Amino acid sequence: MDLPALLPAPTARGGQHGGGPGPLRRAPAPLGASPARRRLLLVRGPEDGGPGARPGEASGPSPPPAEDDSDGDSFLVLLEVPHGGAAAEAAGSQEAEPGSRVNLASRPEQGPSGPAAPPGPGVAPAGAVTISSQDLLVRLDRGVLALSAPPGPATAGAAAPRRAPQASGPSTPGYRCPEPQCALAFAKKHQLKVHLLTHGGGQGRRPFKCPLEGCGWAFTTSYKLKRHLQSHDKLRPFGCPVGGCGKKFTTVYNLKAHMKGHEQESLFKCEVCAERFPTHAKLSSHQRSHFEPERPYKCDFPGCEKTFITVSALFSHNRAHFREQELFSCSFPGCSKQYDKACRLKIHLRSHTGERPFICDSDSCGWTFTSMSKLLRHRRKHDDDRRFTCPVEGCGKSFTRAEHLKGHSITHLGTKPFECPVEGCCARFSARSSLYIHSKKHVQDVGAPKSRCPVSTCNRLFTSKHSMKAHMVRQHSRRQDLLPQLEAPSSLTPSSELSSPGQSELTNMDLAALFSDTPANASGSAGGSDEALNSGILTIDVTSVSSSLGGNLPANNSSLGPMEPLVLVAHSDIPPSLDSPLVLGTAATVLQQGSFSVDDVQTVSAGALGCLVALPMKNLSDDPLALTSNSNLAAHITTPTSSSTPRENASVPELLAPIKVEPDSPSRPGAVGQQEGSHGLPQSTLPSPAEQHGAQDTELSAGTGNFYLESGGSARTDYRAIQLAKEKKQRGAGSNAGASQSTQRKIKEGKMSPPHFHASQNSWLCGSLVVPSGGRPGPAPAAGVQCGAQGVQVQLVQDDPSGEGVLPSARGPATFLPFLTVDLPVYVLQEVLPSSGGPAGPEATQFPGSTINLQDLQ
């Protein structure tokens, strides 16, 4: 249809400038049979806050409107509203420029016979028109024409949300979303801001993006991006100016928030310790440390007597009563634990899977935990955070955990609430840990090994080395540093094998049979050695062998004192030197106390004894009459003799497993010949002399087994000797040459004299030990013969040797290491110097000085 010509002049906006509705005008006349009217509307552009229209009436030609001062686009719309209630025809609009065309895109359809039927109530005709290639939405509601055009993308980003024009409807919202294709509107501005967050990623809203790979943060300003980059670099440029604080922050806002804490540090004061806190919450948390044992909140559930410190803990506990139907059960096979929360079940499952994701980052710690709470509790140890202090006056102890303080508080009450549940045991303890240690005594096996007090006058038995050690310190006044042998795990002896004080009547021949070689019908030396190694350290009471040590030797002799055990370990391939504690030869002799003669001394086989690793030692200079001589002694190579006397007690020889030790030191031809005539060891058991030692080494070497002496109370303990033996076994026999060179070097420097030899009718003097002959006489060796394979040499080593401090130890290919313990008094006589000129004779065997008794080194 053809539209009437539009006026070329723009229209004035009217009294209100801003898009609001104009002054109230009279409502349009009801649609009736009157002729159609023309309506003049002023349409505003989007620059003025959105499209809008103000209706106006005109009869006849419209007057020219006044000019508008604004720069916004305005155009005139002429409407023709038909009579009879038909749908109003949406007239096209045209800008006030000559020559522009109006294209009506949509209009109400009319029937063939006339106007269309009137629309139903509440239905407003709407359509779309295109003006100068711009789409506009047209809506006519109650005589008011509303035009709207969606803003372009560039306009949407620049236009700020403004209050929408108030239409005549009562429920029209005031703030519309500026995003394209979104027509939502909100009554309040903050609602629109929240809604705009859903349009994240819009172009131009966050142009400053983080350049780091993997970081998708974007910001509206460059300052915020710069502040964000500092978090990547771990920079904290804003430091607290308060002295002693030293904290730093990434932003000035965090620093200001921190400074408020300094300003409020003295607001909340603890009434107990006068400590101040910035917040009431921190004060309440601190006050719980003073009243931790008090649990004022009790569960009201019937049958539940649990108490809690805080109300929140009580409420958390109540869920266990009211949510029993929602328990989470552990699905691990064999575990039936249930939890009221899924998070607690998740933490519990980590105990089955071994997952411990929370790792302590402290230096050289490495502890891991299943939950963050346990990790935070563990960090208190590194920070020395002892927040739980004992409230008892004068105590002052503090703890890192509340349960530790609770256990400590019981000690102030004087009660022992933890009672042993075993029937018949009425032991009570103040700590649960003490009850746990006590309960292990009841579950020990009946046949568990027991250890006996090593003091000869004490017969106490113990089930653990700890109790035995405590007994030695408490009852026998032993110092802690003198009891290292009790630390060894092999110091326990089966109680069935301990000798009783009644087994004290033994003869000298019984003692020899006790250390006799392996019988012919035995399974072999290797098997015997393994049994000795597996059996541990055995103990023989000194009173059980007192008769063999001197007949009437009293056990409580004041010159001897309490005797420590002797540990015997076989070593046979180390040449003697000053670095070696004690070296004995083939024949080890037990000397009697008091005056002795050749016939009273019993010879013990060194091959059966093995190596002597630890001996008690005591200086007997205060008792010069302890060991004297009433006869002349002559040197003679004695051989081990077997006892033909029946043993009075057959159980004592069984205490020590007999071990056969093959000698590895060569003997001289003359000595070998004498051995054959004196019932010595067969020559076939001796290896070639060229295998281990040279000529000088042979002169200083011992016989079958090398015996190493170490005081039971010195720094070189039995345990260390055993460990060194193991190390030597790994290194091999490489220390033999070094020991020989050390010995030769000391001889050349004058620090050590070669062994002195004196031959007489009945004895040999070899080194520093006087070895009387056995009961069977034999031919004396020729004069000038050195101590060979069957000689005896003794060297004493102090607690701090001049060597490298490492106890030499070696093991030959056919040598075994039995660990044996014997309570035997051993006497080492003073070295007898050779007489100036003249042959060795009886006068050279006297004892000019005092003696040394190998007993306890206190």
Curated annotation (Swiss-Prot):
The keyword Chaperone does not apply. Expressed at high levels in heart, kidney, liver and testis, at moderate levels in brain and stomach, and at low levels in lung, muscle, placenta, small intestine and spleen. The modification Phosphoserine is found at S34, S665. InterPro entries: Zinc_finger_trans_reg (IPR051061), Znf_C2H2_sf (IPR036236), Znf_C2H2_type (IPR013087). SMART domains: ZnF_C2H2. Belongs to the ZXD family. This is Zinc finger protein ZXDC. It comes from Homo sapiens.
